[in-house]
Amino acid sequence: MESTVATITSTLAAVTASAPPKYDNLWMLILGFIIAFVLAFSVGANDVANSFGTAVGSGVVTLKQACILASIFETVGSALLGAKVSETIRNGLIDVELYNETQDLLMAGSVSAMFGSAVWQLVASFLKLPISGTHCIVGATIGFSLVANGQKGVKWSELIKIVMSWFVSPLLSGIMSGILFFLVRAFILRKADPVPNGLRALPIFYACTIGINLFSIMYTGAPLLGFDKLPLWGTILISVGCAVFCALIVWFFVCPRMKRKIEREVKSSPSESPLMEKKSNLKEDHEETKMAPGDVEHRNPVSEVVCATGPLRAVVEERTVSFKLGDLEEAPERERLPMDLKEETSIDSTINGAVQLPNGNLVQFSQTVSNQINSSGHYQYHTVHKDSGLYKELLHKLHLAKVGDCMGDSGDKPLRRNNSYTSYTMAICGMPLDSFRAKEGEQKGDEMETLTWPNADTKKRIRMDSYTSYCNAVSDLHSESEMDMSVKAEMGLGDRKGSSGSLEEWYDQDKPEVSLLFQFLQILTACFGSFAHGGNDVSNAIGPLVALYLVYKQEASTKAATPIWLLLYGGVGICMGLWVWGRRVIQTMGKDLTPITPSSGFSIELASALTVVIASNIGLPISTTHCKVGSVVSVGWLRSKKAVDWRLFRNIFMAWFVTVPISGVISAAIMAVFKYIILPV
């Protein structure tokens, strides 16, 4: 399918090679440069999410880090691999022989095609819908051809292949991703100790990642790198050789180091440990005191984090902040104390504590115990999922903090809450449920879900879902007045009503050691994908512009070299689109469709790349965007049958369906203006 993208470029260059220069069409060249940059911007805002959407969603990289990496690899890929857009493509969408005597009309058609493709991709990015840039330019090309020469200029067989790709791409990629993730889950994730099997499989994973992506890049035949001169057997031999060499390096050097790192950072740290604590006696700095539940009724312990300087080190009660990861497991009641976080606008406690995170944010703690624990020993605590974006920061760093490491005052802001982390922040900080209800629960009505838990018949679990359902809050039943406390579920509880039992029905989380194993693998696959994307999809934006420029400079021929600066021009436009608007589609790919973990993200990336390589070589119509969406949905359904947002997937599929006609209509309208108004003059 990628070869189809360069149709306009190569065919326009070929049919105008012998034509006299059209210096009076300088205005059209300038207009083409402007529209091509807008088109590159739209490609960056939409298509780049294919590469780093899942990496951002799993939390292995931040959005800023993803933009930096994507900018580097997209630009380098466009310069090194994008030169293939000047090659001759014999099987195109339109019959260019019809334009032998009307080069002006074909140039106008190129401008129209770029305009139609850019407009629809920008609209799709605004709607946060990932679509195929290839299909956009194809639809726009058909649109201007229909206006210029009617149906006789269109090769409808190519359009049939596009329709087939709507179903072949997501289905084939989804099957392959599902098989890979099933194997990973069966042999690694579901083991009591996943580290041994994970370390054994690590060289295989790295070898497959390097081999598949190298073959994909070299098989494109980039002239600048000399890949066009490599025979098929040479490409296979180089790819396999590099894969084996990488596997040996990983087995002898990476695996031992990874094992030590896991033992040091994960296994040496208990899954539940105090994040901050204050000793009851300054002379016993290394002793941990416990607070009996019965004492709570007679005392009002208030926690405070102070600087470790003489006069400020007051003797206060111990306070343990307990974050339980994963599903509910019973623990001694004395280890779990009620927590409450006052709202940012109403922090009026005389004693407040603030824990400063490594990123500069502050978590404001304020504890109010009265009326929270009654004689029956009821308590409130929260469950935090391990695939959340702040998990490693909160567990692996804060639990090592010592008294006096950070200091806060009553004016400190709580940890910033936005659309993605509102409920997550509330859960980890212990915000009372009624505070959340007062703000948001009354907009659409409150919903509460009662889950059946063994040995806990009297407990009600109240789920606080962000749009991506990162976490839930757990609260015991205190009194009749609290029974009406419920939380608005932003992710549609209607699709999940009637569920009961373990949260594993919804999510299949990665253990910390598993996350460490797959983190760099997912980053590596994303970087390879971004590099290949820069080479392939730069032709969507710059292909028609290259042809216009070569025709204007009288250098168009079947063997004309593509100027590198034009490819870099397109790469810059793609990067700008990513930085300005890319987060919208990245959120859809990495968060909104289904929650992503490092293991599932790696399965999605690797299987998608393998699908594109295989399907392209055997002649099946394929689209990178459709493959990635199909993999995300397939793996998400395997991880949890109710975690996929099927309504969003339906909207994405409808966007695929209308991409070709909408971009074609826009292009046809612009072409009509050129043909009947501008060019006749």
UniProtKB/Swiss-Prot annotation:
<keyword id="KW-0472">Membrane</keyword>
<feature type="region of interest" description="A">
    <location>
        <begin position="553"/>
        <end position="560"/>
    </location>
</feature>
<feature type="transmembrane region" description="Helical">
    <location>
        <begin position="234"/>
        <end position="254"/>
    </location>
</feature>
<comment type="similarity">
    <text>Belongs to the inorganic phosphate transporter (PiT) (TC 2.A.20) family.</text>
</comment>
<dbReference type="GO" id="GO:0005886">
    <property type="term" value="C:plasma membrane"/>
</dbReference>
<feature type="transmembrane region" description="Helical">
    <location>
        <begin position="602"/>
        <end position="622"/>
    </location>
</feature>
<protein>
    <recommendedName>
        <fullName>Sodium-dependent phosphate transporter 1</fullName>
    </recommendedName>
</protein>
<keyword id="KW-0812">Transmembrane</keyword>
<dbReference type="GO" id="GO:0008283">
    <property type="term" value="P:cell population proliferation"/>
</dbReference>
<comment type="function">
    <text>Sodium-phosphate symporter which preferentially transports the monovalent form of phosphate with a stoichiometry of two sodium ions per phosphate ion. May play a role in extracellular matrix and cartilage calcification as well as in vascular calcification. Essential for cell proliferation but this function is independent of its phosphate transporter activity.</text>
</comment>
<feature type="modified residue" description="Phosphoserine">
    <location>
        <position position="273"/>
    </location>
</feature>
<feature type="transmembrane region" description="Helical">
    <location>
        <begin position="561"/>
        <end position="581"/>
    </location>
</feature>
<feature type="region of interest" description="Disordered">
    <location>
        <begin position="266"/>
        <end position="295"/>
    </location>
</feature>
<keyword id="KW-1003">Cell membrane</keyword>
<feature type="transmembrane region" description="Helical">
    <location>
        <begin position="25"/>
        <end position="45"/>
    </location>
</feature>
<feature type="transmembrane region" description="Helical">
    <location>
        <begin position="106"/>
        <end position="126"/>
    </location>
</feature>
<dbReference type="InterPro" id="IPR001204">
    <property type="entry name" value="Phos_transporter"/>
</dbReference>
<keyword id="KW-0769">Symport</keyword>
<dbReference type="GO" id="GO:0031214">
    <property type="term" value="P:biomineral tissue development"/>
</dbReference>
<keyword id="KW-0597">Phosphoprotein</keyword>
<dbReference type="GO" id="GO:0006817">
    <property type="term" value="P:phosphate ion transport"/>
</dbReference>
<dbReference type="Pfam" id="PF01384">
    <property type="entry name" value="PHO4"/>
</dbReference>
<feature type="modified residue" description="Phosphoserine">
    <location>
        <position position="269"/>
    </location>
</feature>
<feature type="transmembrane region" description="Helical">
    <location>
        <begin position="66"/>
        <end position="86"/>
    </location>
</feature>
<feature type="transmembrane region" description="Helical">
    <location>
        <begin position="162"/>
        <end position="182"/>
    </location>
</feature>
<keyword id="KW-1133">Transmembrane helix</keyword>
<keyword id="KW-0813">Transport</keyword>
<feature type="transmembrane region" description="Helical">
    <location>
        <begin position="201"/>
        <end position="221"/>
    </location>
</feature>
<dbReference type="GO" id="GO:0005316">
    <property type="term" value="F:high-affinity phosphate:sodium symporter activity"/>
</dbReference>
<feature type="compositionally biased region" description="Basic and acidic residues">
    <location>
        <begin position="275"/>
        <end position="295"/>
    </location>
</feature>
<keyword id="KW-0592">Phosphate transport</keyword>
<feature type="transmembrane region" description="Helical">
    <location>
        <begin position="652"/>
        <end position="672"/>
    </location>
</feature>
<keyword id="KW-0675">Receptor</keyword>
<comment type="function">
    <text>(Microbial infection) May function as a retroviral receptor but do not confer infection susceptibility to Gibbon Ape Leukemia Virus (GaLV), Simian sarcoma-associated virus (SSAV) and Feline leukemia virus subgroup B (FeLV-B).</text>
</comment>
<dbReference type="GO" id="GO:0005436">
    <property type="term" value="F:sodium:phosphate symporter activity"/>
</dbReference>
<feature type="transmembrane region" description="Helical">
    <location>
        <begin position="514"/>
        <end position="534"/>
    </location>
</feature>
